[in-house]
Amino acid sequence: MMQTKNWMALVGLTCAAFIFNTSEFIPIGLLTDIANDFLTTEAQAGMIISIYAFVVMLLSLPLMIVVSRFEMKKLLSSVIFVFVGFQLLSAVSTSYYMLMLSRIGVACAHAIFWSIVSPLAVRTVPEKYKSLALSMIVTGTSVAMIFGLPIGRVIGLHIGWRMTFLCIGIFAFVLMIYLMLILSKVPSRGTFSLQKLPFLFRKSVLLDFFIISFTIATSYYTGYSYIEPFLKQVAGLQDNWITVTLVIFGAMGILGSLAFSRFYNKNPYKFTDFVLLGIFGCLMLLQAAACCSLTIILLCALWGMVFTASNVVLQAETINNSPIEATAVSMSIFSGIFNLGIACGTYIGGQVCTHFSMSDIGYAGAVLAFITFIYWNKIIKKKMKEKAVCC
């Protein structure tokens, strides 16, 4: 059984996942205000988001290698402290470039945080609760999508966008104190150097999961990056129903993470079959479902559930197939690859919208989702079953 202290630590880590992802999403809802304040275009203000993702992608691995020898509780506290400092810098930024610098600092903290939070959550709980720990971390991300961005936007609209960053910084500081008090020391599992990377990549199944992490993220964000204009222009939903649909989308992600904790360990192969086929099916049927408000809302609900479930599967198998001393580094590689997939998916979706039609974004994503499903079934699943027999 889980002790109260385990639960309290896990809830604290889930809240940390919520606040880090809220911070990542926040500028999306504040771009117009930021652009107006600094007398720039929204496109220029949008570079804050693009550069943030690029920094996370580029620095996840090298930063994690540098800090891999540190005790994990102390490392987490330091990362949140840096996060708080740069949030406060965002709140007092007097120029576009000062804000950009502060967001780069937040991105560096983000890169390390997402490399350690899942391994830390797994090590905080008893063995039988590992799936629950991972699902709760991803639930924090889903809740950020549902509530974090809207709350941040409301704060920004009423008392200024700077106050949004200030509130995030204050919340994170309180959370840092809480985690310092409640978390037990979690020793590092050894240093990791660049010389060990070739050995890590010789872990065949791990490399396969890195590959499909990229293809899943790319296929998903080919469609999801443009879901708002798709719902408006193709499905013909009104603004209030678009908001409702996106909230349902995120809320069903919580159900997906709970489904993982309940069913994945019982039959990981069938569960992964279901979520990968679900992603393919949702993308393939996106245009057809747009004929009716009810069908597109139901499709988005299923899409949110299966994608979130697939994300937890990828994180779980990245940890399961990594050497004990390299789990945090493996997660940093996963984070970088996933962010690359986000960038590629957004680019592909944009090209489809430009050269074909917005109604075709689902088909473009479905092609890659189908290739992912075939790769999983013909290669990865076979290797995992052979490995299970050998063990």
Q: How should these model regions be labeled?
A:
Residues I112-V125, A309-P323:
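Intracellular juxtamembrane helix-capping segments at the cytosolic ends
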Residues L59-E71, G256-P268, C353:
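Helix-to-loop junctions at the C-terminal end of transmembrane segments
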Residues N321-M358, G365:
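A late C-terminal transmembrane helix in Major Facilitator Superfamily
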Residues M98, E127-L181, Y226, F230:
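Helix-loop-helix hairpin linking two adjacent transmembrane segments in secondary transporters
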Residues S102-G140:
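Cytoplasmic helix-loop-helix junction between adjacent transmembrane helices
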Residues L58-T94:
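Conserved MFS/SLC helix-loop-helix module at the cytosolic interface between two early adjacent transmembrane helices
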Residues L39, E71, V92-M98, A109, ...:
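Helix-breaking motifs and short loop linkers at transmembrane-helix boundaries and internal kinks
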Residues V82-L89, Y97-G105, L294-L302:
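Paired small-residue
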